[in-house]
Regions:
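A short glycine-rich, hydrophobically flanked beta-strand micro-motif that places a catalytic Asp/Glu
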Residues: 41-42, 151, 216-228
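Conserved N-proximal alpha/beta basic substrate-recognition cap immediately N-terminal to
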Residues: 7-104, 119
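A short beta-strand motif that forms the metal-chelation/ATP-contact edge
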Residues: 51-55, 114, 162-164, 229-244
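Active-site nucleotide/adenylate-binding loops and adjacent lid/helix of ATP-dependent enzymes
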Residues: 4-7, 12, 70-71, 78-159, ...
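Phosphate-binding site of ATP-dependent enzymes
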Residues: 128-214
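N-terminal helical cap/lid subdomain that shapes the substrate entry/recognition surface
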Residues: 273-391, 414
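Asp-based, Mg2+/Mn2+-dependent phosphohydrolase catalytic module
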Residues: 268-278, 390, 394, 401-511
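C-terminal active-site "lid" helix and adjoining low-complexity regulatory extension at the edge
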Residues: 26, 212, 216, 225-275
Length: 511
């Protein structure tokens, strides 16, 4: 059973419904995955004997002290809430010590006087002061209420609200001053955003690093993008409402919870890999080595979103399925087609399908931009995979113990070559070549036979598809490592057939 702890109303000023919505969305997904869920109020919470994990929005000292005695996983951790998110001054000092940009104590553009410890429960807990005299008055007023004030300088630039789930691809950011959606009315002091250009990928990785330094799994915050493109972190919070992106966020949050429940002893896995325990390590390709565990349908959809393609997700999904079926039935992909050419052909089929159904839609306006986005993302993923193959599995590669097993079009070797992965595998078992497709367990047996391994228990299978990789490999007796990422459907398997679960290569690989 997983116990979900609701946030008390006093900790959800103007956000009570939104906080309830994200918790309920997450719980619904976990129920669909087969978990028993019990929801309790934080003011009534006590430890449950049969709990496998706690997912907690709690912020009260009473609930957090109780949770601190838990022997099962707690998301977010008590430490992240108690030490880092409830103490604004300590959080700022900690982030600065970790090398992240934070507001200075003094400045010439005004000040923010904030409740130093605990959470903002009303507008009087966060006050803008245009000058030092107003700052002194705001501090005095806060002190009179029995609240210790914390002061930092106002930072000019674009205000950005960001949301993430640590060590997953989920990261979103928004400009609240574009639409005026703010928790308190005093948040509009940065004015109309300029949308100053900055590196969005770098923001994603840096925000994830910020969250990890605070021990947060579910996180959000406020950041200022200065005119020079530098980012300054104003506040980082535990478990925000994810109001603009709660459906997507809930999917990744569910992945994180399932991983916590079925994580397995990851130290044992590292030890086995490093000590040469396995006679074979078998990798899936698509989704595992080239997209960080994310289903390729989702990766393409996110590229459509990033480029502003005027199509809704249901139509995109139809186009994606149509393209997959078309490529499966017709010899469109040739054996020497590399990744770029393969993807160009796939996208062309998708976009032509959309054009037939959307008036005024022209594929040529979108093809190159989508393709460039996907190539950039794939290069980033495969660069890390190359590093993992070289550093973590290097001895296995040298001894010819690494195998690729993939459902592909007959050109996987050309694709591997484009990304420098062609020397990583002694054998490649490709469905279009051998005539067997996943989830048939036989394709995994073919991989074992290819290098003369007779004992499946001495093989490790790594794949992103629970149904096509993990279950059949488990059935024949292999150890399995499930690379759990954003799936094609919101229903997430419970992971019980996986020996280990990861949401990032960094779960098993330490550079």
């Amino acid at each position: 059973m997983i116990v979900a702890i609701k946030r008390a109303k006093r900790f959800s000023p103007n956000s009570e419904d939104k906080d309830a919505r994200i918790l309920n969305s997450l719980c619904d997904l976990l129920r669909q995955s087969g978990f028993d869920i019990r929801i309790v109020d934080e003011d009534d919470f006590c430890l449950q004997k049969d709990a496998e994990a706690y997912i907690s929005m709690a912020r009260s000292d009473k609930a957090l002290v109780e949770l601190d005695a838990s022997k099962v996983p707690v998301i977010n951790t008590v430490r992240s809430v108690f030490e880092y998110c409830q103490n604004r001054e300590f959080q700022t000092v900690h982030l600065a010590a970790c090398g992240f940009n934070v507001p200075e104590p003094k400045g010439k553009d005004g000040y923010w006087v904030k409740k130093a410890y605990g959470y903002s429960e009303c507008e009087d807990d966060v006050v803008f002061a245009p000058d030092e005299e107003a700052c002194k008055a705001a501090k005095a007023a806060m002190s009179e209420r029995g609240v210790k004030p914390y002061v930092c300088a106002h930072v000019k630039g674009d205000l950005v609200k960001f949301y993430g789930v640590s060590d997953t691809p989920f990261f979103r950011f928004y400009y609240p001053d574009d639409d005026g959606e703010m928790k308190f009315s005093n948040n509009g002091h940065n004015g109309v955003p300029k949308h100053t250009p900055f590196d969005e990928y770098d923001f994603m990785y840096e925000a994830n690093a910020v969250a990890k330094s605070l021990d947060l799994d579910f996180y959000g915050g406020d950041c200022i993008i200065r005119d020079d493109g530098e980012r300054v972190y104003i506040d980082v919070n535990d478990w925000p409402s994810y109001s603009r992106c709660y459906k997507e966020a809930a999917e990744y949050m569910a992945i994180k919870v399932i991983k916590a429940v079925h994580h397995g002893n990851i130290d044992l896995l590292r030890e086995r890999i490093e000590n040469g325990y396995y006679e074979a390590v078998i990798f899936d390709y698509g989704g595992t080595l080239d997209s960080d565990g994310m289903h390729w349908g989702k990766r393409i959809w996110h590229a459509y979103q990033k480029n502003g393609v005027p199509v809704d997700e249901p139509l995109f999904r139809d186009a994606y399925v149509h393209a997959e079926r078309t490529l499966a039935k017709n010899p469109i992909i040739q054996g020497n087609d590399d990744f770029t050419e393969t993807l160009r052909k796939k996208l062309t089929i998708e976009l032509d399908y959309i054009q037939e159904r959307v008036e005024g839609f022209y594929p040529d306006e979108w093809l190159d931009d989508i393709l460039d986005t996907l190539i950039e993302a794939t290069e980033e993923s495969t660069n890390l995979s190359n590093e993992v193959m070289r550093e973590l599995f290097g001895d296995y590669v040298k001894k010819g113990k690494t195998i690729l097993v993939s459902n592909f079009y007959g050109n996987v070797n050309a694709v591997l070559s484009q990304f420098g992965l062609d020397d990583s595998f002694s054998q490649v078992i490709e469905s279009a070549v051998v005539g067997v497709r996943k989830p048939d367990p036989e394709i995994w047996r073919m991989g074992l036979r290819a290098i003369g391994v007779s004992d499946p228990s001495k093989a490790l299978v790594i794949g992103d598809s629970y149904d096509k990789d993990i279950i059949p490999a488990h059935e024949i007796g292999c150890d399995t490592l499930w690379f759990m990422g954003e799936g094609w459907t919101p229903v997430i398997p419970d992971g019980a057939k996986a020996n280990w679960v990861m949401t990032s290569w960094f779960d098993v690989y330490e550079p």
